């Protein structure tokens, strides 16, 4: 059984040892249900399509491992960006499609994703590919900040 020390994450805010934020989060007062309802439209406005979603509360309930939190992860993709990145570096596929997590914490809605700038900075890649990854990540940030 896996045990996670929640206070570790509260204190460290998902930072790496070098101080880079690995998980980018945005908090909004917009209700969770509204964010989930509008996420597809906001993604399309930024050139991303939603490929699928995973409602962990429902999935884990059916497996006999219920959780109290409503956590949904959306897989989003910009096909032309994915093509360019994958043609440059196949291994980056482990981070694709991009994922946006939506859940409620302390009465507010939280949107979270992997900080692709941190990922790009940690890879030995050329500046053109790094710049392209940064650009895609900025679109994800814009989607996540749509409710603020």
Where are these regions (language model features)?
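Beta-strand/loop substructures that line and gate deep hydrophobic ligand-binding cavities in soluble
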Residues: 99-126
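Compact, glycine-rich, soluble single-domain proteins
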Residues: 55-98
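Terminal, regulation- and interaction-focused segments at domain boundaries
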Residues: 18-46
